[in-house]
Amino acid sequence: MGQKVNPIGLRLGINKNWNSRWYADKSYRSMLYEDLKIRGYLKKKLYHAGISHIDIERAVNKAKVNIYAARPGIIIGKKGAEIEKLKKELENVSSSEIIINILEVRKPEIDAQLVAENIATQLERRVAFRRAMKKCVLTALKFGAKGIRVSCSGRLGGAEMSRTEWYREGRVPLHTLRADIDSGFTEAKTAYGQIGIKVLIFHGEVLPGRKELEKP
């Protein structure tokens, strides 16, 4: 089962936390839809800033949006001008007052989502898929990952029949619940169609009585 299920969803409450942290009763549907709109809007607008993930915490009529980015300077802008502009745009999408918090991803080379997006960018630039996969795998190990698995699925190399190819180095123990595994997925839009890229990175084990591993 560990091979099939999302590794982050499987570890919620063990060594992973929810990306949306709020409670709603009758307004659950509208708030969930708001979260999806906020995430979709930010991902599209701030793609070049290297967005790893977005956490949303809600209180009464307030929503705190934590944006984890590899290049926070692009989001903040000169003297924080871009932040204010972004806040107003998000308040048009949401019915709550928005508080934006930008957090830097210090090691984007071992962040699964950013690695997947890096491979996607290379594929869109017509880099050979095996070369792109291998380069990212070796870079992740160099920056301290204990293990990494990358898989690409689609019309690889312009082949007529779609297939899946994967590359793994080190350990990626999907059945071990105490293992700190990061997961990322994106799609590359190539001339031959879409190619799905999935990345799993193993950062080490979170042992009982020990604090959660420091995030990249």
Curated annotation (Swiss-Prot):
Binds the lower part of the 30S subunit head. Binds mRNA in the 70S ribosome, positioning it for translation. HAMAP family: Ribosomal_uS3_B. This is Small ribosomal subunit protein uS3. It holds the Pfam family KH_2. Keywords: Ribonucleoprotein, Ribosomal protein, RNA-binding, rRNA-binding. GO terms for cellular component: cytosolic small ribosomal subunit. Gene3D superfamilies: 3.30.300.20, Ribosomal protein S3, C-terminal domain. GO terms for biological process: translation. InterPro entries: KH_dom, KH_dom-like_a/b, KH_dom_type_2, KH_sf_prok-type, Ribosomal_S3_C_sf, Ribosomal_uS3_bac-typ, Ribosomal_uS3_C, Ribosomal_uS3_CS. Signal peptide: none annotated. It comes from Syntrophus aciditrophicus (strain SB). GO terms for molecular function: mRNA binding; rRNA binding; structural constituent of ribosome. The gene is rpsC. SUPFAM superfamilies: Prokaryotic type KH domain (KH-domain type II) (SSF54814), Ribosomal protein S3 C-terminal domain (SSF54821). Part of the 30S ribosomal subunit. Forms a tight complex with proteins S10 and S14. Belongs to the universal ribosomal protein uS3 family.
